[in-house]
Amino acid sequence: MALSKDELKLEENYLENTSKEISNQIDVLGKEIHVKKEKLTEFRKVLWEDKGSIDASEMQTGLMSSEFEASFMLIKMDYYRKLLKIEYSPYFGRVDFTENGCDLRKVYIGLTNVEKDLDYIVYDWRSPIASLFYDYGIGKAKYEAPEGEINGDISLRRQYKIENNKLVRVFDNDLNVVDECLQEVLSEKSSDK
């Protein structure tokens, strides 16, 4: 089904805003990683230079603190790499889901999650809510969340092909059918692991 001009404009705006947020997060995270890396390197250097003047327990505490910071930085670096992967194609699917007794939620699905102001603007394709896209067409649907089964209705199921932050193809699909385009995206990304 073809999108109206108004719907297409809304989708283009969402893509533009999502792309800006991803670019912003890449910039902020890149700078943060660089600064933390320098501080961690300097801390370790000072720790080893002063090893003769500090006792074993202080050395152990310093090393443990250093390892904790390094682990935290690795997590940030992993997310940074994921953001770089999706920078020009942030999502490939969407479902509009109304949980029983709640407002409609537009769930955009991509290769990793993207948050803005404590809300997800893109959900990771492996998240529980993303199963709505894979397991259901239009109509009654449910997914298993940490707090239990969530029931509701899907009113829209949309697929996208995005290249260089431009909508190449957008179409609504009311059936639970994974198309060739989606299979291609998933197989490319899973082989990148």
Language-model features: where?
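Extended, charged low-complexity regulatory segments
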Residues: M1-D192
